[in-house]
């Protein structure tokens, strides 16, 4: 689409979202647009420090988990000793950015609001890791903690997956992987999905929205995909294009959150409509006035905190 025809998003977002967009960090260098991926990852981690401040304190433990690809770091957030379930969190970042530090506040709030143990999995980023390595690492971590639940003093009888953006795709893909391959890691009580991508190649929102403000132009989305996938055939894999999977049966209850001015919004809408059409348990909520990635900004933005509370409430209602 000709750029001039796109929606004037920055004029339409909420007052709270505008405050976030206009918040400056004076000691932060400019985004290294032409830098290496290592430099961009470093910048992303530095930029998120401000937004992660002031998160709830709780018992936190770090463990390295063995997988066939090597060791993967995990971080456990334990809000109480008698957790009713364990929720695995997969961070967003277009498959190429992000880590356990960039999403620390999100995981802490989710643990606090749900009173469940939250385990963040620092899956290997792309392009170093290609599909389906991240999913296989997530599944391996889930199996590891299921087998070692008593040693780690966690409740793995009921589990869930949660994620934002690319992490939302990984969350649902991992749940479907466990179902399809009949791997028992505990009952999957729910899946929490904030503004994910689930396999659409094109859509109204992908045409109308997306720009330099969110890093989600059509060119950006293509770049993330090319970094993540091994080959063209992977685009049709039921664990990348999740609409090619069987969404008519045994899908865990899904909380699907959409951001109003997110180019990926139609992915969330289609996922909800598909699940609902086949009587699969699901809930969709649209957060007005928001951009993609708004979940990070709960320090300043009430809507972000609300979205985390909504997800936590949905999950605990399934227990």
UniProtKB/Swiss-Prot annotation:
InterPro entries, A to Z: AB_hydrolase_3 (IPR013094), AB_hydrolase_fold (IPR029058), Acetyl_esterase (IPR023508), GDXG_lipolytic_enzyme (IPR050300), Lipase_GDXG_HIS_AS (IPR002168), Lipase_GDXG_put_SER_AS (IPR033140)
Instruction: Please report which protein family the annotation says this sequence is part of.
Output: Belongs to the 'GDXG' lipolytic enzyme family.
How would you summarize the oligomeric state and partners of this protein?
Homodimer. Interacts with MalT and MelA.
State the protein's purpose.
Displays esterase activity towards short chain fatty esters (acyl chain length of up to 8 carbons). Able to hydrolyze triacetylglycerol (triacetin) and tributyrylglycerol (tributyrin), but not trioleylglycerol (triolein) or cholesterol oleate. Negatively regulates MalT activity by antagonizing maltotriose binding. Inhibits MelA galactosidase activity.
* A GO cellular component annotation in the UniProt record: cytoplasm
Q: What is this protein called in UniProt?
A: Acetyl esterase
| First-tier enzyme category under EC | hydrolase
Q: Name one GO molecular function term.
A: carboxylic ester hydrolase activity
PROSITE patterns associated with the record: LIPASE_GDXG_HIS, LIPASE_GDXG_SER
Q: What is its EC number?
A: 3.1.1.-
Catalytic residue list:
165, 262, 292
Sorted alphabetically, which NCBIfam families does this protein's record hold?
PRK10162.1 (NF007547)
Pfam families from the xrefs?
Answer: Abhydrolase_3
Per UniProt, the keywords (alphabetical) are: Cytoplasm, Hydrolase, Serine esterase
Q: Where does this protein reside within or beyond the cell?
A: Cytoplasm
The organism's taxonomy opens as: Bacteria, Pseudomonadati, Pseudomonadota, Gammaproteobacteria, Enterobacterales
Q: Where is this motif: Involved in the stabilization of the negatively charged intermediate by the formation of the oxyanion hole?
A: 91-93
The protein's matches in PANTHER family, at most eight in alphabetical order, are given as:
AB HYDROLASE SUPERFAMILY PROTEIN C4A8.06C, ALPHA_BETA HYDROLASE FOLD-3 DOMAIN-CONTAINING PROTEIN-RELATED
């Amino acid at each position: 689409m000709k750029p001039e025809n796109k929606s004037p998003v920055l004029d339409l977002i909420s007052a709270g979202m505008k405050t976030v967009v206009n918040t400056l960090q004076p000691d932060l260098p400019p985004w290294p647009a032409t830098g290496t991926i290592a430099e961009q990852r470093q910048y992303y981690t530095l930029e998120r420090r401000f937004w992660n401040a002031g998160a709830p304190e709780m018992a936190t433990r770090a463990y390295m988990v063995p997988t066939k690809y090597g060791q993967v770091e995990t971080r456990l957030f334990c809000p109480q000793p008698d957790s009713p379930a364990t929720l695995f969190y997969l961070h967003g970042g277009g498959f190429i950015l992000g880590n356990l530090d960039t999403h620390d506040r999100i995981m802490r709030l989710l643990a606090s609001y749900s009173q469940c143990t939250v385990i963040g999995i620092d899956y290997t980023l792309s392009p170093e890791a290609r599909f389906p390595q991240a999913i296989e690492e997530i599944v391996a971590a889930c199996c590891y903690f299921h087998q070692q639940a008593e040693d780690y003093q966690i409740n793995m009888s009921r589990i869930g997956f949660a994620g934002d953006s690319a992490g939302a795709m990984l969350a649902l893909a991992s749940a479907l992987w466990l179902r399809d391959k009949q791997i028992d890691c505990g009952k999957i009580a729910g899946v929490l999905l904030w503004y994910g991508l689930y396999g659409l190649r094109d859509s109204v929102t992908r045409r109308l929205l997306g720009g330099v403000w969110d890093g989600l132009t059509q060119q950006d989305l293509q770049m993330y995909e090319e970094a993540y996938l091994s080959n063209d055939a992977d685009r049709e894999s039921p664990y990348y294009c999740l609409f090619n999977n069987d969404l008519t049966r045994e899908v865990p209850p899904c909380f699907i959150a959409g951001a109003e001015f997110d180019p990926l919004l139609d992915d969330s809408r289609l996922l909800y409509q598909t699940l609902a059409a086949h009587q699969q348990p699901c809930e969709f909520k649209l957060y007005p006035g928001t951009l993609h990635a708004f979940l990070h900004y709960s320090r300043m933005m009430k809507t972000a905190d609300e979205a985390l509370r909504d997800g936590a409430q949905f999950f605990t209602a399934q227990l």
